[in-house]
Amino acid sequence: MGVPSFFRWLSRKYPKIISPVLEEYPVIEDGVQLPLDYSSANPNGELDNLYLDMNGIVHPCSHPENKPPPETEDEMLLAVFEYTNRVLNMARPRKVLMIAVDGVAPRAKMNQQRARRFRSARDAKLQNEAREQVLREREDYGETIDENVKSKKTWDSNAITPGTPFMDKLATALRYWTSFKLATDPGWKNLQIIISDATVPGEGEHKIMNFIRSQRADTQYNPNTTHCIYGLDADLIFLGLATHEPHFKILREDVFANNNYKKPKPQDMINLSEEEKQQLIQQDSEKPFLWLHISVLREYLSAELAIPHLSFQFDFERAIDDWVFMCFFCGNDFLPHLPCLDVRENSIDILVDIWKTVLPKTKTYLTCDGTLNLEPVEALLEQLGDRETDLFKKKYIQEVRKQEAHDRRKKLKSNPNVSQGKVDRNFMIPLENMPVYDVDGNAAEGSLNLSNKDFANMRKEINLANEGDGEAAKALKLKSEKNSGVVEFSSEELKNSVQLSKTANYDAATSLQEKLIAKKMAMRDEENAEELSLKRKSEDVDSAEKETSNEPEDDEADYDEDEGSTVPPAVIHTGIVKSGFIDTDESVRLYEPGYHDRYYQHKFHVPAKDIPALQKDVIRCYVEGISWVLLYYYQGCASWTWYYPYHYAPFAQDFKNIKNLDIHFDLGEPFLPYEQLMSVLPAASGHALPEIFRPLMSDPNSEIIDFYPEEFPVDMNGKKMAWQGIALLPFIDETRLLKTVREQYSKLSDSEKARNVRKKDALLISNKNVNYDLFMKNLYGENPVNVIEFRHFKSGLSGFVTQAEEGFELNSKLICPINGGGLPDLSTNLFLKLSYTQPVVAGRCKSLVLNGYIPPQPMLTPQDRDCIIYKYSNRWNPSMMKYNIVPVGPSGITQYQPRVGGYRSFFFHKEQTAYAQQPQQNREYMHSQQRQPQGSRYQQSRYNNGNYNNSNNGYSDNNNGNTGKYNRHYNNSRGNSNRYSNSNDRRREFRR
């Protein structure tokens, strides 16, 4: 998601939310690597459901940054299997595994995808040119380059888009690999696998959200289900909070540890030896992972968002929703962030402070179950607008100070003889570097008269002479004497030679200077961060975090917050350009009076007289945008066709009279895969489309040729890194595009038409699953039915299944679609593949914690809470994370009553309550007469083991001084009770 450095900022502000992954490694016996036992206990704590945002795996496997890229697509898919298997061995889900691949996105997301893919194509072109330049230079030095190496091009990552042949192959490969694991790994026998590939519309992470909401709607749903989502997107944190599932965590690569790895340059990847390749692959496979615990983040937010002496009842769940909503103003995938806000500048803290003053006055929250309350939103933005001018000035002053500090450090580093104030080092010049000349300026007697070329060509003789070899010394002396011969030149020849020498020296110096400058600029951010860390400066020069992809800070790029070049681009500050980098902030000057009108004139290109009308439209569109984003996170996609039609956001001070706006959306329908490809791909990536569409992107006479510019400007918008710029691409005219594209559908082949469809999710189970016999009997028996509904209690999954859309046949073979890897064909009797439909959610999803929830073990101490409440400075060190171990799952006694018809984990609640109220002398008799659960209808709670269900560590009598803290948060007007008990014998059985 488009919130650069959000994860880094959050983990520094709330350090206990992250903990290291305890990873087991395969054992090698007699040179054979034995696989891990998936069924063994998980050292990280047991997990029910794991969700994989698959684009965060496919991108780094297909075009890795720290190792040579795979040679073929089959090698890419094998790398995907290996990476996925590693993630699964860390998490070890026991009930559900959902693999979600990005499908066709809403139109609001396509604008960002379009900008990314156009820039990706241009970056690939520059990378190929740089690679060819390196190869030419190596050939000039006499190195022989293989023709296969010379002809190789960078793999186009834009192929990771729904509708391409690669995505079709990926879906087939994932279905095969999961079937292979179900058939061969005993630890997977009870695992239910849902695969939502690119033919299912929707972004991967939001498919996962829809699934969780649908499961919560089942009355048999266990409110203590433990969830984990793997992905590199920053918005997964918001999604985890938006589920209101407290037993939720996020698995991701450790970006702090990844900063310690040196990123190889493209030229370093050419002609690597096999040993060097294996070394890089080994280094990449050892990258550590970490957990981000939503339960601990909720604890921090309970302290952060607490407002004493409110005149109405505080609802912690709605306060969390307000916090998530305020974070959207700092950046998201669908709207530009407000100009005055930046995560690195603690803008979220500013919004929280304002929210704490607005809430007591308005006596209502900003949001309710995903719907905006515009009156308090306007009050929030009004107060932010009052601070806006001061924020711009403060930001400018900080930037000037940072630049001055950087210039000082640069001067000290380039000239070590300049005094630094403590010890005068002006006279400390290394004498050994002085040339050996006599007083007349001639070479000293006995010195060798050799040129640089001679030294390079006679390196061997020099080394031997230094070791006492007389023959080598003699050869050097002869060469020196030969160079000492006197040659007579005319005055004109001398004059010309001097001029040529000056020119050559100037060219060489210029070339060297350019290389040095480029090198210093590339190293500048790294050096700054290191020096500031050592000196513990208060000014935090924080490079944007790498969540991704390399951020992708989001989907495909979403795994890479720091994608793109780290070298500041050459920026054009004046004039109107059609390509290259520009910076409109130079002319806007937000820190000077009059910036308001200059902002709209230079960024929106309107005259002063049209600013009021434009401003009104921009404000309305932006309010629609934040309403759409909030609904998207909490209820699902409100409209497939809506999008924000501007490249820039308005000022906070301009949000006036928005409470009367009537905001509504038309649902529409998603694009087909080829329609999205034509919307987001540049002409350079036309190879990923059927051939019939390619002329539409390149033919000058095409009706839609204006959608595919080869050159386009990038506005740096006051930023320094190339990836932070805004690509100023034309917006797609949906009507014109769809009309032109759909006219070509009749010319597609059958195989091409098969990739341009919408499908359902696939469900795969092993032949040992508890539902296998039920599904086989009713779908493939003598009297088959069309649809089977199954509930949550039996297997931890609910929904509807039908026979597989893509002809799954019993008693047949599933052919391995990948060459290499030694993977066999599979018998279809070992597993079952079905089409899966999620339960229908009736009405709106409510923002609350479900009854029957057992809180996890509290992790914060009173000191931790005080640090948040009183804003103490936090000198956090990422190396301390290894000591932070967070218990997983529920702990203690619930304060909720069971709901009628719901999950019956507390079936004996009434009987146990009656037992607790009996006189002491009657209890022994009653206890001896209690019926003990027997047979398959009863199952002991898996939470009654170890410390995960020990009442001594429970809610009411924990030792960290936080007794009763959940009382005020969860005893709210939604009907949740705060009753709880200290009995050690509670919750001993779950009854089916």
Curated annotation (Swiss-Prot):
Top-level taxon of the source organism: Eukaryota
Skewed-composition ranges (Low complexity): 928-962, 969-983
Molecular-function GO terms, alphabetical: 5'-3' RNA exonuclease activity; RNA binding
Compositional bias (Acidic residues): 550-564
Subcellular localization, as worded in the UniProt entry: Nucleus
Matching Pfam families: XRN_M, XRN_N
EC category: hydrolase
A single cellular component GO annotation: nucleus
UniProt keyword list: Exonuclease, Hydrolase, mRNA processing, Nuclease, Nucleus, rRNA processing, Transcription, Transcription regulation, Transcription termination
UniProt region (Disordered), positions on chain: 528-568, 916-992
Basic and acidic residues composition bias: residue spans: 528-549
Documented EC number(s): 3.1.13.-
CDD domains reported in the protein's UniProt record: PIN_XRN1-2-like (cd18673)
GO BP, sorted A to Z: DNA-templated transcription termination; mRNA processing; nuclear-transcribed mRNA catabolic process; rRNA processing
Gene3D superfamilies xref list: 1.25.40.1050, 3.40.50.12390
Oligomeric and partner information: Interacts with RAI1; the interaction is direct, stabilizes RAT1 protein structure and may stimulate its exoribonuclease activity. The interaction also stimulates RAI1 pyrophosphohydrolase activity, probably by recruiting it to mRNA substrates.
Protein's job: Possesses 5'->3' exoribonuclease activity. Required for the processing of nuclear mRNA and rRNA precursors. May promote the termination of transcription by RNA polymerase II. Essential for vegetative cell growth and chromosome segregation.
Family listed: Belongs to the 5'-3' exonuclease family. XRN2/RAT1 subfamily.
Protein name stated in the entry: 5'-3' exoribonuclease 2
Organism in which the protein naturally occurs: Kluyveromyces lactis (strain ATCC 8585 / CBS 2359 / DSM 70799 / NBRC 1267 / NRRL Y-1140 / WM37)
Lineage: Eukaryota, Fungi, Dikarya, Ascomycota, Saccharomycotina
